[in-house]
Amino acid sequence: MFKEFKIFIMRGNVVDLAVGIVIGAAFGAIVNSLVKDVLMPPIGLLLGNVDFGNLFIVLKEGAIGGPYESLLVAQTAGAVTINYGVFINALINFLILAMAIFFFVVRPLNQLAARQKSKEAVIPAQTDKKDCPYCDTQIPLKASKCPYCTSELM
């Protein structure tokens, strides 16, 4: 049983999947840091010192009454909130990740496939057959007589 499991794990596609998941998680962490630490602070500064992580709407106050200075204070007080700032961060994070995957993975693969397809279209298929000029059936290229209509070929 262990031997079968070892064979399964060592298959190429399982290892490739594991590597893809690890690299994808690392890439997601990089994009998340890019959005949170590099892009959002200048955008927040341009909009008047807005911290998108602290944009929220209080639906129900917690044990300690509001107004709450930050999302963390509201959550600590037990307030029920809609965290639309966190959602905006996640949305920007997703858009950047989707654009990166499109431009660095999907688009190059599509271009490679199109290039491969155009190479196949340019190279004519070499065949060892020809059409009989009398009955229009496929016959061997070296045939001197058609086996179907028995016509003499030149």
UniProtKB/Swiss-Prot annotation:
InterPro entries, sorted: Mechanosensitive_channel_CS, MS_channel, MSC/AndL, MscL_channel
Keyword tags: Cell membrane, Ion channel, Ion transport, Membrane, Transmembrane, Transmembrane helix, Transport
Provenance organism: Dehalococcoides mccartyi (strain CBDB1)
Assigned GO CC terms: plasma membrane
TM regions (residue ranges): 14-34, 86-106
Membrane topology field: Multi-pass membrane protein
Protein name: Large-conductance mechanosensitive channel
PANTHER family: LARGE-CONDUCTANCE MECHANOSENSITIVE CHANNEL, MECHANOSENSITIVE CHANNEL MSCL
Lineage: Bacteria, Bacillati, Chloroflexota, Dehalococcoidia, Dehalococcoidales
Compartments, record wording: Cell membrane
MF annotations from Gene Ontology: mechanosensitive monoatomic ion channel activity
Subunit annotation: Homopentamer.
Major place of residence: membrane
Lineage: superkingdom: Bacteria
HAMAP family to which the protein is assigned, alphabetical: MscL
Record flagged with keyword Repeat: no
Entry's family note: Belongs to the MscL family.
